[in-house]
Amino acid sequence: MDPCDCSKTGKCNCGGSCTCTNCSCTSCKKSCCACCPSGCTKCASGCVCKGKTCDTTCCQ
């Protein structure tokens, strides 16, 4: 369950079950993606995705 770093390329795939674009999860089946909600510059690693973004409590 390695979080993927969207900040480097803006896109990433994570374990085949997460796809990030512009640091937002476009699809998630498990908590593997380090995706940032609106107004969040960085999310904690291991952040749990709910729907298409992580919870705002993940913000650092």
From Swiss-Prot:
Binding residue positions for a divalent metal cation 2: 6, 12, 14, 25
Residues reported in the UniProt entry to bind a divalent metal cation 7: 49, 54, 58-59
Beta, as annotated region: 1-28
Residues the record lists as binding a divalent metal cation 3: 14, 18, 23, 28
Residues involved in a divalent metal cation 1 binding: 4, 6, 20, 23
Stretches the record annotates as Alpha: 29-60
GO MF, one annotated term: metal ion binding
Residues at which a divalent metal cation 6 binds: 36, 40, 43, 59
One of the GO BP terms on file: response to zinc ion
Binding site for a divalent metal cation 4: 32-33, 43, 47
Keywords noted in UniProt: Metal-binding, Metal-thiolate cluster
Domain comment, as recorded: Class I metallothioneins contain 2 metal-binding domains: four divalent ions are chelated within cluster A of the alpha domain and are coordinated via cysteinyl thiolate bridges to 11 cysteine ligands. Cluster B, the corresponding region within the beta domain, can ligate three divalent ions to 9 cysteines.
Family label: Belongs to the metallothionein superfamily. Type 1 family.
Protein's name according to its UniProt entry: Metallothionein
Source species: Oryzias latipes (Japanese rice fish)
Gene: mt
